[in-house]
Protein backbone atom coordinates (compact mmCIF):
# COMPACT_ATOMS: atom_id res chain seq x y z
CA UNK A 1 0.00 0.00 0.00
CA UNK A 2 1.31 3.44 -0.95
CA UNK A 3 1.34 4.94 2.54
CA UNK A 4 3.34 8.10 3.12
CA UNK A 5 6.27 7.74 5.51
CA UNK A 6 5.99 11.42 6.40
CA UNK A 7 3.48 12.44 9.08
CA UNK A 8 2.68 15.58 7.13
CA UNK A 9 1.88 16.15 3.48
CA UNK A 10 3.85 18.63 1.43
CA UNK A 11 0.53 20.02 0.22
CA UNK A 12 -0.85 22.83 2.34
CA UNK A 13 -4.55 23.29 2.91
CA UNK A 14 -4.29 26.69 1.21
CA UNK A 15 -2.97 25.02 -1.94
CA UNK A 16 -5.67 22.37 -1.85
CA UNK A 17 -8.40 24.99 -1.48
CA UNK A 18 -7.06 27.03 -4.37
CA UNK A 19 -6.52 24.20 -6.85
CA UNK A 20 -9.52 23.31 -9.05
CA UNK A 21 -11.64 20.43 -7.80
CA UNK A 22 -14.77 18.44 -8.55
CA UNK A 23 -17.06 16.52 -6.22
CA UNK A 24 -18.94 13.77 -8.04
CA UNK A 25 -20.41 11.97 -5.01
CA UNK A 26 -22.32 14.58 -3.06
CA UNK A 27 -25.68 13.96 -1.40
CA UNK A 28 -27.87 17.04 -1.08
CA UNK A 29 -29.76 15.71 1.94
CA UNK A 30 -26.50 14.89 3.71
CA UNK A 31 -24.86 18.25 3.05
CA UNK A 32 -27.04 20.97 4.55
CA UNK A 33 -25.57 23.79 6.59
CA UNK A 34 -26.40 22.92 10.21
CA UNK A 35 -27.72 26.40 10.99
CA UNK A 36 -29.91 26.24 7.88
CA UNK A 37 -31.25 22.85 8.98
CA UNK A 38 -32.34 24.46 12.24
CA UNK A 39 -33.89 27.41 10.39
CA UNK A 40 -35.78 25.10 8.00
CA UNK A 41 -37.00 22.92 10.86
CA UNK A 42 -38.40 25.89 12.73
CA UNK A 43 -40.02 27.25 9.57
CA UNK A 44 -41.68 23.91 8.80
CA UNK A 45 -42.37 22.92 12.42
CA UNK A 46 -40.11 19.87 12.26
CA UNK A 47 -38.92 18.54 15.61
CA UNK A 48 -35.15 18.21 16.02
CA UNK A 49 -33.16 16.66 18.90
CA UNK A 50 -31.54 20.08 19.39
CA UNK A 51 -31.93 23.55 17.96
CA UNK A 52 -28.28 24.54 18.33
CA UNK A 53 -25.43 23.59 16.03
CA UNK A 54 -23.34 22.23 18.92
CA UNK A 55 -26.31 20.21 20.10
CA UNK A 56 -26.83 18.66 16.67
CA UNK A 57 -23.12 17.85 16.47
CA UNK A 58 -23.26 16.15 19.88
CA UNK A 59 -26.44 14.17 19.26
CA UNK A 60 -26.74 13.55 15.52
CA UNK A 61 -23.90 14.65 13.23
CA UNK A 62 -20.95 13.25 15.12
CA UNK A 63 -17.25 13.00 14.36
CA UNK A 64 -17.47 9.22 14.61
CA UNK A 65 -20.30 6.68 14.50
CA UNK A 66 -20.79 3.18 15.86
CA UNK A 67 -22.07 1.80 12.57
CA UNK A 68 -23.86 2.61 9.31
CA UNK A 69 -27.24 2.73 11.05
CA UNK A 70 -26.15 5.49 13.41
CA UNK A 71 -24.55 7.33 10.49
CA UNK A 72 -27.86 7.31 8.60
CA UNK A 73 -29.89 8.49 11.58
CA UNK A 74 -29.52 12.16 10.67
CA UNK A 75 -31.22 11.77 7.31
CA UNK A 76 -34.65 11.52 8.93
CA UNK A 77 -34.26 15.17 9.91
CA UNK A 78 -32.69 16.49 6.71
CA UNK A 79 -35.26 14.77 4.49
CA UNK A 80 -38.10 16.06 6.67
CA UNK A 81 -37.07 19.71 6.29
CA UNK A 82 -36.45 19.29 2.55
CA UNK A 83 -40.07 18.35 1.83
CA UNK A 84 -40.54 22.04 1.19
CA UNK A 85 -39.72 23.78 -2.08
CA UNK A 86 -38.27 26.91 -0.46
CA UNK A 87 -35.97 24.78 1.68
CA UNK A 88 -34.93 22.68 -1.32
CA UNK A 89 -33.93 25.72 -3.32
CA UNK A 90 -32.11 27.21 -0.34
CA UNK A 91 -30.22 23.99 0.38
CA UNK A 92 -29.14 23.58 -3.24
CA UNK A 93 -28.01 27.20 -3.48
CA UNK A 94 -26.03 27.06 -0.24
CA UNK A 95 -24.42 23.76 -1.19
CA UNK A 96 -23.13 25.24 -4.44
CA UNK A 97 -21.87 28.38 -2.67
CA UNK A 98 -20.11 26.34 0.01
CA UNK A 99 -18.29 24.41 -2.71
CA UNK A 100 -17.39 27.58 -4.59
CA UNK A 101 -15.94 29.06 -1.41
CA UNK A 102 -13.41 26.22 -1.15
CA UNK A 103 -12.41 26.23 -4.80
CA UNK A 104 -14.67 23.49 -6.13
CA UNK A 105 -15.53 24.20 -9.76
CA UNK A 106 -17.84 21.31 -10.59
CA UNK A 107 -20.33 19.32 -8.54
CA UNK A 108 -22.78 16.56 -9.25
CA UNK A 109 -25.50 16.80 -6.65
CA UNK A 110 -27.38 13.58 -6.01
CA UNK A 111 -30.52 12.90 -4.03
CA UNK A 112 -33.64 10.71 -4.09
CA UNK A 113 -36.51 12.92 -5.30
CA UNK A 114 -39.09 10.36 -4.17
CA UNK A 115 -37.87 10.71 -0.58
CA UNK A 116 -38.73 14.41 -0.74
CA UNK A 117 -41.99 14.29 -2.71
CA UNK A 118 -45.36 14.91 -1.08
CA UNK A 119 -47.91 15.01 -3.93
CA UNK A 120 -50.80 15.84 -1.59
CA UNK A 121 -49.07 19.15 -0.85
CA UNK A 122 -48.13 19.79 -4.47
CA UNK A 123 -44.53 18.68 -4.03
CA UNK A 124 -44.20 16.54 -7.16
CA UNK A 125 -41.23 15.14 -9.02
CA UNK A 126 -41.18 18.12 -11.38
CA UNK A 127 -41.43 20.76 -8.65
CA UNK A 128 -38.70 19.08 -6.61
CA UNK A 129 -36.36 18.98 -9.60
CA UNK A 130 -37.01 22.61 -10.50
CA UNK A 131 -36.48 23.81 -6.92
CA UNK A 132 -33.09 22.10 -6.71
CA UNK A 133 -32.07 23.28 -10.17
CA UNK A 134 -33.16 26.86 -9.43
CA UNK A 135 -30.92 26.96 -6.37
CA UNK A 136 -27.91 25.49 -8.16
CA UNK A 137 -28.37 27.69 -11.22
CA UNK A 138 -28.64 30.84 -9.12
CA UNK A 139 -25.33 30.05 -7.43
CA UNK A 140 -23.73 29.14 -10.77
CA UNK A 141 -24.84 32.35 -12.46
CA UNK A 142 -23.69 34.54 -9.57
CA UNK A 143 -20.26 32.93 -9.44
CA UNK A 144 -19.71 32.99 -13.18
CA UNK A 145 -20.44 36.74 -13.21
CA UNK A 146 -17.99 37.37 -10.37
CA UNK A 147 -14.54 38.91 -10.55
CA UNK A 148 -13.05 35.51 -9.71
CA UNK A 149 -14.04 34.31 -13.18
CA UNK A 150 -14.18 37.57 -15.14
CA UNK A 151 -10.94 39.15 -13.91
CA UNK A 152 -8.92 36.60 -11.96
CA UNK A 153 -9.17 33.87 -14.60
CA UNK A 154 -10.55 31.13 -12.39
CA UNK A 155 -12.50 28.39 -14.18
CA UNK A 156 -16.28 28.85 -14.16
CA UNK A 157 -18.58 26.79 -11.98
CA UNK A 158 -20.85 24.10 -13.43
CA UNK A 159 -23.06 21.35 -12.03
CA UNK A 160 -25.13 18.31 -12.88
CA UNK A 161 -27.89 16.49 -11.01
CA UNK A 162 -27.90 12.74 -10.34
CA UNK A 163 -31.20 11.18 -9.31
CA UNK A 164 -31.12 8.30 -6.86
CA UNK A 165 -33.51 5.40 -6.78
CA UNK A 166 -33.70 3.60 -3.44
CA UNK A 167 -32.77 -0.05 -3.04
CA UNK A 168 -35.09 -0.40 -0.08
CA UNK A 169 -38.00 1.40 1.57
CA UNK A 170 -40.95 0.33 3.67
CA UNK A 171 -44.67 1.00 3.60
CA UNK A 172 -44.47 3.83 6.12
CA UNK A 173 -42.00 6.26 7.63
CA UNK A 174 -39.82 6.78 4.56
CA UNK A 175 -41.76 9.39 2.59
CA UNK A 176 -45.36 10.25 1.69
CA UNK A 177 -44.67 9.17 -1.89
CA UNK A 178 -43.39 5.73 -0.90
CA UNK A 179 -46.29 5.20 1.52
CA UNK A 180 -48.68 6.03 -1.32
CA UNK A 181 -46.88 3.57 -3.63
CA UNK A 182 -47.46 0.76 -1.15
CA UNK A 183 -51.12 1.70 -0.88
CA UNK A 184 -51.56 1.70 -4.66
CA UNK A 185 -49.72 -1.61 -5.09
CA UNK A 186 -50.98 -3.32 -1.97
CA UNK A 187 -51.17 -6.73 -3.68
CA UNK A 188 -47.55 -6.62 -4.84
CA UNK A 189 -44.47 -7.97 -3.12
CA UNK A 190 -42.37 -5.24 -1.43
CA UNK A 191 -39.46 -5.70 -3.85
CA UNK A 192 -41.84 -5.22 -6.79
CA UNK A 193 -43.09 -1.95 -5.28
CA UNK A 194 -39.49 -0.81 -4.86
CA UNK A 195 -38.62 -1.72 -8.46
CA UNK A 196 -41.74 0.03 -9.75
CA UNK A 197 -40.78 3.21 -7.92
CA UNK A 198 -37.27 3.01 -9.37
CA UNK A 199 -38.65 2.65 -12.90
CA UNK A 200 -40.98 5.60 -12.34
CA UNK A 201 -37.96 7.63 -11.22
CA UNK A 202 -35.81 6.90 -14.26
CA UNK A 203 -38.68 7.52 -16.68
CA UNK A 204 -39.47 10.86 -15.03
CA UNK A 205 -35.78 11.78 -15.04
CA UNK A 206 -35.46 11.24 -18.77
CA UNK A 207 -38.72 13.09 -19.42
CA UNK A 208 -37.77 16.18 -17.41
CA UNK A 209 -34.26 16.19 -18.88
CA UNK A 210 -35.56 16.04 -22.44
CA UNK A 211 -38.73 18.12 -22.21
CA UNK A 212 -37.73 20.74 -19.63
CA UNK A 213 -33.99 20.96 -20.31
CA UNK A 214 -32.89 20.33 -16.74
CA UNK A 215 -29.30 19.06 -16.28
CA UNK A 216 -30.26 15.64 -14.95
CA UNK A 217 -27.07 13.86 -15.95
CA UNK A 218 -27.16 10.50 -14.22
CA UNK A 219 -28.90 7.72 -12.32
CA UNK A 220 -27.79 6.17 -9.04
CA UNK A 221 -29.14 3.43 -6.81
CA UNK A 222 -28.60 4.06 -3.11
CA UNK A 223 -29.53 2.42 0.16
CA UNK A 224 -28.89 -0.95 1.75
CA UNK A 225 -26.71 -3.18 -0.43
CA UNK A 226 -27.20 -6.33 1.63
CA UNK A 227 -30.37 -8.08 0.52
CA UNK A 228 -31.02 -5.68 -2.36
CA UNK A 229 -28.48 -6.57 -5.06
CA UNK A 230 -28.01 -4.45 -8.15
CA UNK A 231 -29.31 -7.10 -10.54
CA UNK A 232 -32.84 -6.56 -9.24
CA UNK A 233 -32.71 -3.12 -10.86
CA UNK A 234 -31.34 -4.24 -14.21
CA UNK A 235 -34.45 -3.11 -16.12
CA UNK A 236 -34.21 0.34 -14.52
CA UNK A 237 -30.60 0.75 -15.58
CA UNK A 238 -31.38 -0.68 -19.01
CA UNK A 239 -33.90 2.14 -19.49
CA UNK A 240 -31.29 4.71 -18.46
CA UNK A 241 -28.75 3.07 -20.77
CA UNK A 242 -31.11 3.15 -23.75
CA UNK A 243 -31.88 6.82 -23.12
CA UNK A 244 -28.30 8.11 -22.76
CA UNK A 245 -28.64 8.77 -19.03
CA UNK A 246 -25.26 8.06 -17.47
CA UNK A 247 -24.98 5.62 -14.62
CA UNK A 248 -23.29 5.38 -11.25
CA UNK A 249 -24.04 2.77 -8.60
CA UNK A 250 -23.45 2.64 -4.86
CA UNK A 251 -21.44 -0.57 -4.77
CA UNK A 252 -18.83 -2.03 -2.48
CA UNK A 253 -19.59 0.31 0.40
CA UNK A 254 -20.94 -2.28 2.82
CA UNK A 255 -20.90 -5.47 0.72
CA UNK A 256 -18.31 -7.50 -1.11
CA UNK A 257 -16.75 -7.19 -4.54
CA UNK A 258 -19.58 -9.22 -6.09
CA UNK A 259 -21.74 -6.12 -5.58
CA UNK A 260 -19.26 -4.16 -7.69
CA UNK A 261 -19.30 -6.90 -10.34
CA UNK A 262 -23.10 -6.68 -10.57
CA UNK A 263 -22.98 -2.90 -10.86
CA UNK A 264 -20.73 -3.27 -13.90
CA UNK A 265 -22.37 -6.24 -15.60
CA UNK A 266 -26.04 -5.73 -14.71
CA UNK A 267 -26.28 -1.94 -14.45
CA UNK A 268 -23.71 -0.78 -17.05
CA UNK A 269 -22.06 1.43 -14.41
CA UNK A 270 -19.98 4.28 -15.83
CA UNK A 271 -18.69 5.02 -12.32
CA UNK A 272 -18.71 3.28 -8.95
CA UNK A 273 -19.82 4.89 -5.71
CA UNK A 274 -17.37 3.99 -2.91
CA UNK A 275 -16.00 0.71 -4.28
CA UNK A 276 -14.26 0.16 -0.96
CA UNK A 277 -14.64 -3.62 -0.85
CA UNK A 278 -12.86 -4.16 -4.18
CA UNK A 279 -9.62 -4.91 -2.33
CA UNK A 280 -11.23 -6.69 0.63
CA UNK A 281 -11.70 -10.29 -0.55
CA UNK A 282 -12.75 -11.27 2.97
CA UNK A 283 -15.98 -9.30 2.40
CA UNK A 284 -17.01 -11.58 -0.50
CA UNK A 285 -19.95 -13.78 0.54
CA UNK A 286 -20.71 -15.55 -2.75
CA UNK A 287 -19.81 -19.17 -2.03
CA UNK A 288 -19.37 -19.91 -5.74
CA UNK A 289 -16.23 -17.74 -5.74
CA UNK A 290 -13.55 -20.17 -4.59
CA UNK A 291 -10.48 -17.96 -4.91
CA UNK A 292 -11.64 -14.65 -3.52
CA UNK A 293 -8.27 -12.91 -3.77
CA UNK A 294 -7.93 -13.85 -7.43
CA UNK A 295 -11.49 -12.67 -8.10
CA UNK A 296 -10.71 -9.29 -6.53
CA UNK A 297 -7.48 -8.93 -8.51
CA UNK A 298 -9.17 -9.71 -11.82
CA UNK A 299 -12.06 -7.36 -11.10
CA UNK A 300 -9.67 -4.57 -10.13
CA UNK A 301 -7.68 -5.09 -13.32
CA UNK A 302 -10.88 -4.95 -15.38
CA UNK A 303 -11.96 -1.70 -13.71
CA UNK A 304 -8.53 -0.15 -14.18
CA UNK A 305 -8.31 -1.23 -17.82
CA UNK A 306 -11.76 0.14 -18.62
CA UNK A 307 -10.95 3.39 -16.75
CA UNK A 308 -14.16 3.10 -14.75
CA UNK A 309 -13.82 5.79 -12.11
CA UNK A 310 -14.28 5.15 -8.39
CA UNK A 311 -15.88 7.86 -6.25
CA UNK A 312 -13.77 7.63 -3.07
CA UNK A 313 -15.27 8.93 0.19
CA UNK A 314 -12.62 8.48 2.89
CA UNK A 315 -14.21 10.06 5.95
CA UNK A 316 -17.59 8.50 5.23
CA UNK A 317 -16.06 5.03 4.88
CA UNK A 318 -14.15 5.42 8.14
CA UNK A 319 -17.37 6.43 9.89
CA UNK A 320 -19.65 3.73 8.48
CA UNK A 321 -17.03 0.98 8.76
CA UNK A 322 -15.13 1.54 12.03
CA UNK A 323 -13.36 -1.80 11.53
CA UNK A 324 -11.02 -0.06 9.07
CA UNK A 325 -9.37 1.47 12.12
CA UNK A 326 -6.81 3.92 10.76
CA UNK A 327 -6.97 5.76 7.46
CA UNK A 328 -3.74 4.12 6.33
CA UNK A 329 -5.70 0.85 6.19
CA UNK A 330 -8.25 2.24 3.75
CA UNK A 331 -8.26 0.54 0.35
CA UNK A 332 -7.55 3.86 -1.35
CA UNK A 333 -3.91 2.85 -1.06
CA UNK A 334 -4.56 -0.29 -3.12
CA UNK A 335 -6.53 1.76 -5.62
CA UNK A 336 -3.51 4.00 -6.10
CA UNK A 337 -1.14 1.05 -6.44
CA UNK A 338 -3.37 -0.57 -9.05
CA UNK A 339 -3.73 2.67 -11.02
CA UNK A 340 -7.49 2.93 -10.73
CA UNK A 341 -9.17 6.16 -11.81
CA UNK A 342 -10.09 7.61 -8.42
CA UNK A 343 -11.96 10.79 -7.54
CA UNK A 344 -11.87 12.30 -4.05
CA UNK A 345 -15.44 13.04 -2.89
CA UNK A 346 -17.24 14.04 0.30
CA UNK A 347 -20.39 11.89 0.25
CA UNK A 348 -22.13 13.99 2.94
CA UNK A 349 -20.65 17.30 4.00
CA UNK A 350 -22.86 17.65 7.09
CA UNK A 351 -23.16 14.05 8.22
CA UNK A 352 -19.41 13.50 7.83
CA UNK A 353 -18.54 17.09 8.81
CA UNK A 354 -16.12 17.43 5.93
CA UNK A 355 -15.27 19.36 2.76
CA UNK A 356 -13.59 18.45 -0.51
CA UNK A 357 -10.41 20.19 0.63
CA UNK A 358 -10.50 18.28 3.92
CA UNK A 359 -10.83 14.99 2.06
CA UNK A 360 -7.85 15.81 -0.15
CA UNK A 361 -5.83 16.81 2.91
CA UNK A 362 -6.63 13.52 4.64
CA UNK A 363 -5.67 11.51 1.57
CA UNK A 364 -2.46 13.37 0.87
CA UNK A 365 -1.33 13.38 4.50
CA UNK A 366 -1.73 9.61 4.62
CA UNK A 367 -0.80 8.29 1.19
CA UNK A 368 2.22 9.06 -0.97
CA UNK A 369 0.82 11.01 -3.92
CA UNK A 370 3.32 12.94 -6.05
CA UNK A 371 2.15 16.03 -7.92
CA UNK A 372 1.62 14.19 -11.22
CA UNK A 373 -0.66 11.64 -9.54
CA UNK A 374 -2.48 14.43 -7.71
CA UNK A 375 -3.13 16.15 -11.03
CA UNK A 376 -4.43 12.84 -12.40
CA UNK A 377 -6.90 12.56 -9.51
CA UNK A 378 -8.04 16.14 -10.08
CA UNK A 379 -8.31 15.45 -13.81
CA UNK A 380 -10.56 12.43 -13.30
CA UNK A 381 -13.06 14.73 -11.60
CA UNK A 382 -13.39 16.69 -14.83
CA UNK A 383 -12.84 13.91 -17.37
CA UNK A 384 -15.01 11.24 -15.74
CA UNK A 385 -17.87 13.52 -14.76
CA UNK A 386 -21.32 13.48 -16.35
CA UNK A 387 -20.98 17.01 -17.70
CA UNK A 388 -24.33 18.43 -18.91
CA UNK A 389 -22.87 19.88 -22.12
CA UNK A 390 -21.57 18.06 -25.17
CA UNK A 391 -18.22 16.28 -25.38
CA UNK A 392 -16.42 19.21 -27.03
CA UNK A 393 -17.59 21.52 -24.24
CA UNK A 394 -16.57 18.98 -21.61
CA UNK A 395 -13.07 18.62 -23.07
CA UNK A 396 -12.61 22.38 -23.23
CA UNK A 397 -13.74 22.77 -19.62
CA UNK A 398 -11.41 20.00 -18.43
CA UNK A 399 -8.52 21.59 -20.32
CA UNK A 400 -9.25 24.97 -18.73
CA UNK A 401 -9.35 23.56 -15.21
CA UNK A 402 -6.14 21.56 -15.63
CA UNK A 403 -4.33 24.59 -17.00
CA UNK A 404 -5.49 26.44 -13.90
CA UNK A 405 -4.14 23.57 -11.76
CA UNK A 406 -0.71 24.17 -13.28
CA UNK A 407 -0.98 27.89 -12.50
CA UNK A 408 -1.78 27.19 -8.86
CA UNK A 409 0.94 24.54 -8.60
CA UNK A 410 3.43 27.05 -10.01
CA UNK A 411 2.27 29.70 -7.54
CA UNK A 412 2.98 27.32 -4.63
CA UNK A 413 6.37 26.28 -6.00
CA UNK A 414 5.53 22.76 -7.17
CA UNK A 415 6.34 23.51 -10.82
Q: How should these model regions be labeled?
A:
Residues 2-245, 253-271, 276-415:
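Metal-cofactor-binding active-site regions of metalloenzymes
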Residues 249:
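A glycine- and charged-residue-rich anion-binding loop/surface
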Amino acid sequence: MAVSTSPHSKYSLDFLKEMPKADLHLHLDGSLRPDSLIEMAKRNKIELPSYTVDGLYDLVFKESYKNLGEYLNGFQYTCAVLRDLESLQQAAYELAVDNQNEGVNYIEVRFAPQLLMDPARGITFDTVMHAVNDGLKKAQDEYNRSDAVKREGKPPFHYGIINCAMRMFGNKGFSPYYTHMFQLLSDHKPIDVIKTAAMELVRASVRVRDEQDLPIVGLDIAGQEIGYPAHKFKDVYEYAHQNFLLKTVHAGEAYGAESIFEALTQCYADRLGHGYSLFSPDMIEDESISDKADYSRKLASFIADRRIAVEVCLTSNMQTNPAIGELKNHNFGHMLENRLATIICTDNRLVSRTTVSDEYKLALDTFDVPLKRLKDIVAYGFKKNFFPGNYIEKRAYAKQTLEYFDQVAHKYGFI
